[in-house]
């Protein structure tokens, strides 16, 4: 699953994502290698601790991040939060949280993009496109599986932000007037 809907009201959409089964399985597998190496080796206690600690470090490094997206119409903002256990351990609890805040009015489109996933092939991610031309992924990592799972989330966001509605004739005439008044058209 790409993201889960935590809450959905007319003014607030809260989406969450936690590490998946593949990520947790990899953590348990790598940590098991370290524990087995420590248990079956005839080395000193220091080396055994090194085996377990090293494998724990590699296992946590491969763990996916916890991510959430909060679209709030009452504040007019979207908050994208990311929590990384790996960064939290590296900085000794000083970092680990990333947060991006964007105005809802700046979002112009929501797309699904295909991304190459190392070792596994291709995955899909929802991308928010802004009026400035800048784009930002909804999550930091793509999800493997069916594109339709990711498209459901993209459609949910598009519907919530009412981006699917066509421009009114007044907005169309204003945009064509502003194009005609551009400085390059003057003679």
Curated annotation (Swiss-Prot):
Entry keyword set: Chaperone, Endoplasmic reticulum, Immunity, Innate immunity, Membrane, Phosphoprotein, Transmembrane, Transmembrane helix
Record GO cellular component, one term: endoplasmic reticulum membrane
Cellular compartment(s): Endoplasmic reticulum membrane
UniProt membrane topology term: Single-pass membrane protein
UniProt keyword Chaperone, yes or no: yes
N-terminal signal peptide: none
Modified residues (Phosphoserine): 168
GO biological process: innate immune response; respiratory burst after phagocytosis
Domain of life: Eukaryota
Subunit organization: Interacts with CYBB; CYBC1 may act as a chaperone stabilizing Cytochrome b-245 heterodimer.
Family in the record: Belongs to the CYBC1 family.
Cited function: Functions as a chaperone necessary for a stable expression of the CYBA and CYBB subunits of the cytochrome b-245 heterodimer. Controls the phagocyte respiratory burst and is essential for innate immunity.
Name of protein: Cytochrome b-245 chaperone 1
Native source organism of the sequence: Bos taurus (Bovine)
Chain's gene name: CYBC1
């Amino acid at each position: 699953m790409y993201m889960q809907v935590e809450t959905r009201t007319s003014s607030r959409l809260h989406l969450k994502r936690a590490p998946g089964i593949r990520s947790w399985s990899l953590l348990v597998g790598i940590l098991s290698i370290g524990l087995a190496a420590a248990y079956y080796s005839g080395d000193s206690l220091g080396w055994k601790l090194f085996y377990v600690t090293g494998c724990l470090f590699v296992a946590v490094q491969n763990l996916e991040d916890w991510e959430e997206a909060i679209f709030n119409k009452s504040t007019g903002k979207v908050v994208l939060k990311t929590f990384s256990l790996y960064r939290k351990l590296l900085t000794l609890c000083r970092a680990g949280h990333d947060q991006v805040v964007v105005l809802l009015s700046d979002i112009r489109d929501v797309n699904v993009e295909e991304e190459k996933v190392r070792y596994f092939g291709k995955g899909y991610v929802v991308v928010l496109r802004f009026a400035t031309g800048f784009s930002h992924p909804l999550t930091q990592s793509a999800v493997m599986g069916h594109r339709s799972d990711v498209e459901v989330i993209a459609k949910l966001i598009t519907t919530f932000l009412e981006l699917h509605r066509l421009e009114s004739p007044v907005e169309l005439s204003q945009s064509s007037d502003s194009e005609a008044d551009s400085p390059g058209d003057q003679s």
